[in-house]
Amino acid sequence: MKKYIFLFPLIFITAVLQLKAQERQDNLWKAVFMDYSLSNSSTLRLETHVRTRQFLAENDQYLVRPSISFKVGKFAAVAAGYTFLSTNTPIDRTLENNLWQQFNFSIPVKRSSYFGWIRLEQRWQSKNNVQNYGARIRFRTGFQFPITAEGASFSPKLVVFNEVFLKIKTGFPYEFNQNWTFFGFQNKLGNQLRLLTGFQRITVDKGAGYLHKNVWSSILFYRL
């Protein structure tokens, strides 16, 4: 009898975890971010993203994201921008026009830094001539650590962050949308170039189940 008392909670927990179907993708994300300084306190940025599923086998998303940012203190800035997304979905592509506003910070801690952002998005999506509007808020927080001695000619940094996306209704976050967890490295490739590359684990709530993405993500930053 005691054996069944211990087995019942285990069976119950297993059943709960399997209520939602699980799907997995192994993807590759590539992006280029170009920055142009208008002044000491303002910067224009253009992001272009190409995302593929099953590494390079299938197109997933294209993104174009222009924005402008303004420093509001020694360690903080505000930004606003627009994103166009084209996503490969069954039957037809889903197109999205997205306006967003962001507060971001980066605080030095000795040779390391603590960084993050809060981004608010207004999203207009179109698929099969059906229009939908939604909004969400994104919270990212992370750390950047040096992994070599100070003054070394080769000085990559370890970058770790987590970002949670929440859908918004009547002005308040109310529903989990997705979560990103990233572990990778960033290194300067010259005075104007730096590369951020690493592994990103993404969990997306699809309603009837969860989609898990294992992503190798690489971003090349270029300052004009």
Which residue stretches match the model-derived regions?
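Bacterial Sec-dependent N-terminal signal peptides
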Residues: 1-26, 224
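Repeated loop/turn-to-beta-strand initiation elements of outer-membrane beta-barrel proteins
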Residues: 41-46, 75-80, 110-114, 149-153, ...
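Residues that define the transmembrane beta-barrel architecture of outer-membrane proteins
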Residues: 26-28, 60-62, 95-99, 131-139, ...
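Residue-level signature of outer-membrane beta-barrel architecture
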Residues: 36, 70, 105-107, 145-147, ...
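Outer-membrane beta-barrel "beta-signal"
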Residues: 103, 212-224
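Detector for outer-membrane/organellar transmembrane beta-barrel domains
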Residues: 117-125, 129-166, 222
